[in-house]
Design a protein with these regions (language model features):
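Active-site-proximal helix-loop-helix substrate-binding element of RNase H-like nuclease domains
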Residues: 2-6, 10-82
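Short beta-strand-centered aromatic/proline hotspots
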Residues: 236-249
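Conserved helicase motor core of SF1/SF2 NTP-dependent helicases
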Residues: 371-373, 380-392, 433, 437, ...
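Mixed-charge, glycine-rich, non-catalytic linkers/tails in nucleic-acid processing enzymes
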Residues: 54, 58-138
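ASCE P-loop NTPase motor cores of helicases and related translocases
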Residues: 259-441, 547-569
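Accessory interdomain/linker segments of ATP-dependent helicases and helicase-like nucleic-acid enzymes
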Residues: 106-224, 231-236, 569
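Generic, well-ordered alpha-helical scaffold segments in large soluble proteins
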Residues: 1, 18, 22, 35-42, ...
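A generic structural motif
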Residues: 210-215, 249-264
């Protein structure tokens, strides 16, 4: 919060930009260390020694070996960082001295109000008050907490999750928005020097134009699917410009599907828009928090599945079912379908390693339940993942000769054949019904008008989706089915969050130390149709407790030709 106030008040000055634009110095780089002889600063320790210590600490943190960071290493890294701080202060003082020598005074920037707007202040106040209420009576020591108290502690820490993520994204947004086009050439999250080429042919039901731009050679991390904005000087409205459809670094072209309001704008530069307002998600999470504060974690209703996910409870099933999830010799897809039918306001986690058929299994479950008249929703961290599952549902429907309607709430882009694209939340929620599958991100399912609209919500790639997102979307459905693999990369996060609140949904279910789901937690897809036995053995032992096995016939997979990777690779 202190950092946010300083940034809002524009209290930070980029000394590197000041030096680069205001001085001419006989050095190759205008970095802090290269300027130290100029300003007369001398470090206490040799940079070569402290640099080696810093690398050693970074390695220890990367491999989670914090015990390797002894007092000597810590002291050397602290000395390295202290030297950087003192060097920056010395540079600032040197620049101020040069300023005082000038024949005329240079005006300083006007003070800017550092207080948040009234809506933001009210938002922060509500989060803080509810967090304090949830934490009342919860021991500070984790070892002293009951399971319910730990769940309340996690929920309290997650109430501000989206606010913290949003802050970090806004800081970067305003920094990039204020840069000159030439400066954006050096930013990997941008592309500059744009020259409009023309409009590309529209496809399918595409309602907005896609424009191609040419740009000079530069490094950029922009990828298809990224939303982009123009600089403030090129787009005074400061709103979303469009999203990247394709980018060709060799040809130097970028194709951007524009928003309607930006169809006639042709800016000199674009940068990655990483601010995604999570108003609906935050509101849903706050509603869940208020429910827990008022009624606890064991009340039936639209928050039951969310409570079970937060508390890491085994699948809640109808009375009369046995505690055994998968029966001896039972086919995995049949077991999963039976368990879905038995769910009674609970959560069914399904962990699938590489090539184990997560999407295949999920699609057959979706098809069977939708064909039985259940109201089915699908969500994931991206539209691409949602479309992939919806396409597999279509293939499964074709194999079974079953008619299933598939609807995807998108941002207006083209969708694969057979999938209806709708652009409004009202259209998407209005499509929910028997023999219809509706896909949308967590933003759709977290809305107030989506509450209790579904019998089942399938969360694909739940090993990537943040727990906070999954909890926010959970109130849309009576039951949750989590598909994914906690061993794969999680969704990137920007903010600093309390321990345990910044994990993916399936990682949370699994727990900190476990590699695979226990038999009483959910289903583990233990066969791979992709990995050669030699690769499978290694992968299974290192990542999956030795539980993953290849199906027969994969031993015939081989690389041939003059390569050192001949055979299994």
């Amino acid at each position: 919060e202190i950092l946010d106030r300083l940034l809002r008040g524009q209290r930070f000055v980029d000394l590197h930009a000041v030096v680069r634009e205001g001085l001419r110095v006989g050095v190759e780089r205008y970095g802090l260390k290269e300027l130290e002889p100029l300003v007369g600063f001398r470090r206490d320790l040799d940079l070569r020694d402290t640099g080696a210590a810093r690398l050693a600490v970074e390695l220890a943190l990367e491999i989670s070996d914090t015990a390797a960071i002894d007092d000597e290493l810590r002291a050397r890294v602290e000395a390295y960082n202290r030297g950087d701080c003192l060097s920056a202060a010395a540079l600032r003082d040197w620049l101020e001295a040069r300023r005082a020598e000038l024949p005329q005074q240079i005006p300083r920037p006007m003070d800017t109000d550092s207080e948040p707007s009234e809506p933001v202040a009210e938002r922060d106040r509500r989060i803080e008050e509810l967090s304090n209420a949830l934490l009342a009576g919860v021991p500070a020591n984790p070892a002293e907490r009951s399971d319910a108290e730990q769940a309340r502690w996690l929920l309290a820490g997650m109430l501000g999750y989206f606010r913290r993520e949003e802050k970090s994204a806004w800081w970067e947004h305003f920094r990039l928005s204020d840069l000159e086009s030439e400066e954006l050439l050096a930013e990997r999250e941008a592309v500059a020097g744009l020259e409009f080429v023309g409009e590309l042919p529209r496809t399918g039901r595409q309602q907005v134009p896609t424009h191609r731009y040419r740009f000079p050679a530069q490094e950029t991390a922009l990828d298809p699917g990224d939303k982009v904005r123009a600089r403030a000087i090129d787009d005074p409205e400061n709103k979303t410009f469009g999203d990247v459809v394709a980018i060709d670094l060799v040809a130097g072209t970028i194709d951007v599907r524009k928003t309607k309001r930006a169809k006639d704008l042709h800016p000199a530069a674009l940068f990655h828009e990483q601010v995604v307002k999570a108003t609906a998600l935050e509101a849903a999470l706050l509603a869940f928090g208020e429910h827990v504060h008022a009624d606890g974690l064991d009340v039936d209703g639209s928050f039951r599945a969310a409570s079970d996910l937060l508390c890491r409870r085994p699948p809640r099933r109808r009375a009369g079912t046995t505690s055994v999830l998968r029966r001896p010799g039972e086919d995995l897809v049949e077991a999963a379908l039976r368990l879905c039918r038995e769910l009674d306001g609970g959560v069914l986690p399904i962990q699938g390693p590489p090539g184990s058929g997560k999407t295949y299994t999920g699609a057959r479950l979706v098809l069977a339940l939708a064909n039985e008249g259940k109201r089915i929703g699908v969500t994931a961290v991206s539209h691409k993942v949602i479309e992939n599952l919806l396409e597999e549902v279509g293939r499964a429907a074709g194999e079974s000769n079953v008619a299933i309607r598939r609807v995807h709430k998108t941002d207006g882009g083209a969708t694969p054949a057979g999938i209806e694209s709708v652009v409004s939340n009202e259209e998407a929620l209005g499509a929910v019904g028997p023999r219809t599958v509706v896909g949308g991100t967590a933003w759709l399912w977290a809305r107030d008008d989506a509450q209790a609209t579904l019998d089942y919500l399938f969360v694909d790639e739940a090993g990537q989706m943040a727990l906070a997102q999954a909890l926010a979307a959970a109130r849309a459905a009576r039951n949750l089915v989590l598909l994914g693999d906690p061993q794969q990369l999680e969704q990137p996060r920007r903010g600093a969050h309390p321990e345990g609140t910044n994990v993916a949904a399936l990682v949370h279910v699994l727990g900190a130390e476990a590699a695979t789901l226990r038999d009483d937690q959910g289903l583990f897809l233990d066969r791979t149709w992709r990995l050669h036995p030699a690769l499978c053995t290694f992968t299974s032992e290192v990542y999956y407790d030795g539980r993953l096995e290849p199906v027969p016939g994969l031993e015939r997979q081989a690389l041939t030709g003059p390569t050192p990777f001949a055979g299994s690779g």
